[in-house]
Amino acid sequence: MIENNLVVLSLVVPIFTAIILVFLGQRYRAKRYVTLTGLVLTLIVAIINLRNVYVDGPLKVELGSWPAPYGIIFLLDSFSAMLIVTSIIITILITAFSSTTAGIDRERYYYHFSITFMLVGIIGAFTTGDIFNLFVFFEVFLMSSYALLVLGGTQIQLRETVKYLLVNIVTSTFFVIAVAILYSIVGTLNMADISEKLSTLSNTHGGLLSIVFILFIFVFATKAGAFPMYVWLPGSYYAPPFAIIAFFGALLTKVGVYAILRTLSLFFHNTMSFSHYTILFLALLTIIFGSVGAIAYDDTKKIIIYNIMIAVGVILVGVAMMNEAGIIGAIYYTIHDMLVKTALFLLIGVMYQITKSTSLKDFGGLIKHYPVLGWTFFIAALSLAGIPPLSGFYGKYYIVQATFEKGFYVSGIIVLLSSLVVLYSVIHIFLKGFFGKPKGYEPTQSVNVKHATTISIIAVVITVVFGLSADLLYPLISEAAQSFYDPSIYIESVLGGRS
């Protein structure tokens, strides 16, 4: 019982941290320390939870002692536990990086509160067993993201916030409509219970279920930045400071991917012929359009932003396969991309601190004065491209294996070719930004640059360690994958598991 209550504690600690931050006024230094302390405590709880899940299996919490499917359920399985640990590590890195890059004017107000509360929404989305509460937690982290996007009040931020707000209002509306239709069919909001009931109703309510599927895919693909709903992403992610871009790019899109994977495996497992072809089609177009964007620009921000799309597409190819290799690959690649995108956005943030520009046309020759920064970026670039034995390799290997097992050879080839596009785009930054004649900046060894560089190096080291630990983590990831290609495991954990 104590172990199960720790699941809720991973939500309670950041909530109380956010409440404390409200009462600190404009004392930005105190806010930094309180935020980092709260995040470290949350990480400790999350690591304990991950260990407990690995040893004892999924942990279930029934709020108010109301049993499933009647009460509010939180379920922590291997995948959600890994995602939560990764998310907290990233949040700690971004908070530390923000102290020298976000600007004191932002930190004085609701910057740290918004980061902490956004983490609450993300953790809640990863653990809820209720489809309506998934909507609630989506709204929690979206409201925080609105604040983070607009803080600073620059013209581009205000313009992109309006677009971002409109997109999310529309998708949230369709989310509620989808939940309402689903509830009218099955009479329950518990995701495991919905899955059980749909297994007997899919033949009699096929038309309505197709509408629900389309609505869910529209909502979650928009959140994930998948084709064709990605149009908001390049502009909205370009506007805020680098720390916030890293936060959004690493975490927000992955919540959308998680929601697709969870609902597809539970609600539409019996309609794979339609649903998985739809997701595969969107995934491949996401890779293609992301690849075009990644090689079309000389702007460091835009190159990495479009690489987010490529990664989302690759993950969704694995999800669409819905077999063991595909899901294992999707899980590996999701965690890899969360870590490596954080590292890359922080690294180009350091480059911006030095050069005051994101355009590769405005600077070059950074390797002469910043060799550590340059070679750290090179390692992160190789990891992003999936060069073995770095972290990007393992996820793509399993995803390509899954496509060939299912006979989707063209899909596998597109995933492989995307690695070349990714490698070209990031090596383009490396060669043009770090080599050539130094121009457009005055070399500086300021404390701020050194601090930001150190945090970026730590992020890359964590990414490398994840890649080198792939074999060690395989049993945990394999266990996490089982509940998706065999949804009866998740259903049993919720409706018949221990509490």
UniProtKB/Swiss-Prot annotation:
Membrane-topology descriptor: Multi-pass membrane protein
GO biological process: ATP synthesis coupled electron transport; sodium ion transport
Pfam families according to UniProt: Proton_antipo_M
Transmembrane segments: 5-25, 33-53, 72-92, 109-129, 131-151, 169-189, 207-227, 241-261, 277-297, 303-323, 327-347, 373-393, 410-430, 457-477
Keyword Transmembrane helix annotated: yes
Keyword Nucleotidyltransferase in annotation: no
Cellular component, GO, one term: plasma membrane
Coiled coil ranges: none
InterPro entries (UniProt xref): CPA3_Na-H_Antiporter_D, NADH_UbQ_OxRdtase, ND/Mrp_TM
Compartments it resides in: Cell membrane
Name assigned to this protein: Na+/H+-antiporter, MnhD subunit
Natural source organism: Staphylococcus haemolyticus (strain JCSC1435)
Gene, per the UniProt record: mnhD
